Amino acid sequence: PKLGEVVLDPACGTGGFLVEAYSHMEKQCKTVQQRRQLQQGTILGNEAKPLPYLLAQMNLLLHGLETPRIEPGNSLSVPLREIGDKERVDVILTNPPFGGEEERGILSNFPEDKQTAETALLFLQLIMRKLKRAPKPGRAAVVVPNGVLFGDGIAARIKEELLPEFNLHTIVRLPNGV
């Protein structure tokens, strides 16, 4: 991420990706004003579980972010249709939980034809909605399980939206067990 961009991890865990983003951006600061800008609303996160939420706050504080903006709660609990331009960000870095299932109430936040219990696909939809659009589109680096973009049904419908609307740059597939 570049200085002046807003970075989000919607499932930040203990904040590792956000700490690295902050450290990377801090190296770009050359003036007091730039450091102040970095401290104010540049690094954002959400975490559903209480202990990782507290650890993320502490992790960012220990690495120099004076007022971490980590929100407690599940990022998926906001209906996608309510996410507008003001909620969009420049960069999303995340390793969302996958393999689990979300409670039924969460599914109603997603379009009917894309509702699934597979958490990775829900987070992928959220990420697509939270990224800034043209003229300066946002970027994301997301860890997802093998094959999530190669499934059929809901996965195929999400991919049909992803490919024409976003520039899918790279897919790195790791061998099983890595």
Task: Map each language-model feature to its residues.
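Conserved beta-strand signature within the Rossmann-like core of class I S-adenosyl-L-methionine
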Residues: 136-144
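Short, flexible, mixed-charge acidic loops at enzyme active sites
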Residues: 98-108
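Short beta-alpha connecting loops at secondary-structure transitions
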Residues: 40-44, 107-112, 173-174
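A generic alpha-to-beta junction signature in SAM-dependent methyltransferases
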Residues: 1, 131-135
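Conserved S-adenosyl-L-methionine
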Residues: 1-91, 99-101, 117, 121, 167-176, ...
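Glycine-rich S-adenosyl-L-methionine
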Residues: 109-132
